[in-house]
Amino acid sequence: MIHIIKRIKRLLVILMTASLPGMAGAQRPEIPSNVVKLDAGVSFIASKVYVYNLGDNSIHQYTWKPGFSVKMDYEHFRKSGWGFGVNVMYHNTNFDAGYGAIGYVEGYYEYQFTQWYFGPCAAYRFRFGDSKWMGDVSVGMGYAQFSEGLDGGITEHYGGLGVSWRAGIEYMLSPNIGLGVDLTSLMAFVSQPDYSNTLKALGKDESDGVNGFYRLGLMAGLRIYF
């Protein structure tokens, strides 16, 4: 009986200690309330892209074409780990369009494809125990705009709905600075097919009927906490 009473006392002490203000926080550091991410890296267009090649006068199909990407995120979190924010992304991918002539200008041309995304997101952030490592995920929906064209100046712009998700891991170098890596995804549904007005302006008009792009990226950069 004495042993049982002692165990009950120990349990009560543990429960009271855990419930005291500040004690739980001292055992498990809180997550930052505000986070800014500045990242750069590589991204891949996972969907099919069709490019007219001036050199052999044919359509070339590309899948998983790499490009350059940058992004900036701002997210605000509650103590529970749930939060909200806004995402801005920019992607650029170049394709070889071959040697040919547009009007009176001959030379090697590149097909340039750029993509902007802006939209709000819902996010969740957590710590790995009491360490300086943190992880976070987010999903959002916003506006995606595309620009495409050849060096000769044939350029088209179109946009539509964008859906994004992101998962990341980061390390806090200090209470205000960290470094991290994000896996990103962007799916966009646009008014033009993914082989579109630039090629139509050159007298080509073919499509696989899929109005949109799917892009995966891996980016790393700076984290700012406040």
PLM regions: where:
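Membrane-spanning beta-strand positions in outer-membrane beta-barrel proteins
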Residues: 35-37, 81-83, 132-134, 168, ...
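Extracellular loop and loop/strand-boundary signature of outer-membrane beta-barrel proteins
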Residues: 54-61, 103-111, 148-156, 203-210
